[in-house]
Amino acid sequence: MKGPMMADGRGGPGSRLRDMTAKHERPQDTGKTIARIFSYWKEHWSWLVIMLVSSLCEVFCTLMAPILIGKAIDNCIDLSNMTVDFTKLNVIVIMLLMLYISSSWFSWVQQYGMTNVSLKIAKKIRTQMMDKMLEQDIHFYDVHTRGDLMSRFTNDVELMKSGLGDSFIQLFNTIFTLAGTVVAMVALSPSLTVVCCMSIPVVFMMTNIISKQTRKFFSSQQVSLGQLNGLVEESVSGIKMVRSFGIEQQQIDKFNSINEELRKSGVKAQIYSGLLMPLMRVLENIIYIIVAVLGGIMATSTDMTVFGIGIATITVGTIQSFLLYTKQFLRPINQVASQFNAVQSAIAGAERIFTILDTKPTITNKPDAVTLKEETVKGDIVFDHVSFGYEPGKLILKDISFTAKQDEVIAIVGTTGAGKTTIINLLTRFYDINSGSIKVDGIDIRDITKESLRDQMGIVLQVPFLFSDTVNYNVSYGWPAATQEEIINAS
């Protein structure tokens, strides 16, 4: 019967390796991370096309509205005698209503598609992470706390999903809206368009400066959150040990320390990223005022020149249309700024996710590895000059040799930390030895498939672990094909 994995003994690697977790965070590469996030879109190209078309239609409806409003002012209102042509005005109002309804519907299509696809992508990433974590070596779990892994599995995936959904829709709308708005503004007044476009370099400069500061704080925030989850999980699962040694205050102090680091990194991330929105609003209002003043001058002046260049006069309706376009021109960039926190968190979370997905197990089967079969296995075990250490340069076992023949009952005794659990961990090839060899029936276990080697072993854990399921499920966990009679006999 295949047995479950061995838990760390008191002399095992324990938590002394887990402090290495934060050091294993890979360097940030935002460009590659973003490209990798969107690589998940390949199999959802049809929805991508639908959202692109919907985005174009929404932008078209949005851009047509200011033109109609300008026409209403110029064609429906006679400023000389203050009269209104309600017949024309009613037609324009109905057209505006249809445009706004259509714009809302196309926006809903985008949101529906993005929600649908982002949930599917999140599901795929969770599946990939689960597969990857189950194939990892035991050493992987020595250097990552369970809380940190759970944080990546839940919080980081959720952050990535949220950032992916919001930012992707915003990306489409920003590009299309900016392009369409600039074209419409140039058609109305090239000179005023130049004034508005002067704000673009300022926006990108502010975003670049702030993003460099916030990205590291968001990443630090996620690392601290993982450490906090790990400490809470260990404190709860090991509550008897904590109580037995009376170290409640020590755990509280450690929790408070990590919690404070989480607070500091969170505050810094939010403060720095929060600067962008107020700055964007100030810039938006400044541009709006400048356009309004210049537009008023152009509407009332019959012969206006700037640096010797003649500036065409414009109507009141054109000014109104242009002011609306000014808002639309800055709004997409403004909206990107409002999603800045989510995007930064998504990138930081994605990097932590991809770190797990890119981690390859070091203990693998050789291409020509043999498969042990139950009917041919005898069970002779030989440790031949075996040396091993969990950490480089720190050996737990030094030049150990012994033989356990078929049907022999062997007891391994020793003080805490002597290496009893380590011997079993090496026999099941949860770790690879530093030197020497371990053989089963004369075959080096490194030449045997891991799965067939462990299939021939029955292991009783030092601390039994029960899954949240039935008694039958737990008893037959290592042997799913067991009959009810076999389960009862084993119990």
Residue ranges and their predicted role:
Residues M1-T62, I77-I92, Q110-M114, S118, ...:
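Membrane-integrated ABC transporters
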Residues A22-T30, V53-S54, C61-I77, L99-R146, ...:
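Juxtamembrane helix-loop junctions of ABC transporter transmembrane domains
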Residues F38, E43, I138-H139, V157-L164, ...:
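An intracellular "coupling" helix at the cytosolic face of ABC transporter transmembrane type-1 domains
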Residues L48-F106, V186-S191, V293, T300-T313:
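Transmembrane helix-loop-helix hairpins at lipid-water interfaces of multipass membrane proteins
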Residues M64-P66, G70, I169-S211, V267-Q320:
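A hydrophobic transmembrane-helix motif
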Residues T115, R243-I247, I271, M280, ...:
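Cytosolic ends of transmembrane helices, especially the final helix of ABC transmembrane type-1 domains
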Residues M129, M133, V242, I353, ...:
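Helix-loop junctions and hydrophobic alpha-helical segments within the transmembrane domains
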Residues D358, N365-D368, L372-S491:
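ABC-type nucleotide-binding domain
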